[in-house]
Regions:
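N-terminal targeting signals for export/organelle localization
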Residues: 1-14, 123-126, 135, 146
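A short beta-strand-turn-helix
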Residues: 11-32
């Protein structure tokens, strides 16, 4: 069965510390990639860098949102902000500082990448190997119209 993102899910916060419900951030007709990452997670950063390299090409072909949700604790949030800014990542960056959202998704490992459509998780991937981003793009493409 598809896993839905419900409105009762824990909030995440943006760069300014404003709380947001992921449920409210998702557009029904638009694909959304959610990537759970942290500053101490090398594969996470490799994945986000790899997607950054092809991001503009993806955007030309497909209309999607990308939320990079950091599971860093409060102490590491500054570092996460600096890292994301320093790399000029085009993603919307959010924080899940108590890992409540991550727990609600029932996941314990990062990087953890999801594709969401109509508030349902239609694809989920754990870990990162070079080339995984191509597979992710193909999944986006497959689900864009149907």
């Amino acid at each position: 069965p598809m896993f839905k993102i419900f409105s009762c899910f824990p909030t995440i916060s943006d760069f300014e510390g404003k709380n947001e419900k992921v449920h409210n951030l998702l557009s029904n007709d638009k694909l959304t990639i959610i990537s759970l990452w942290a500053t101490w997670c090398v594969p996470c950063i490799k994945e986000l860098d790899a997607i950054n390299d092809v991001y503009d090409d993806w955007k030309e072909e497909i209309n999607f949102d990308f939320f990079a949700i950091s599971v860093d604790d409060s102490r590491s949030q500054k570092r996460a902000k600096a890292l994301a800014n320093g790399k000029s990542w085009p993603y919307q960056i959010f924080f899940d500082k108590n890992q409540d959202f991550k727990r609600a998704l029932g996941t314990s490992y990062i990087p953890q990448t999801f594709i969401i459509k109509n508030k349902e998780i239609i694809y989920q991937h754990t870990g990162y190997q070079p080339g995984d981003e191509e597979y992710l793009f193909n999944k986006l493409r497959e689900n864009e119209t149907n």
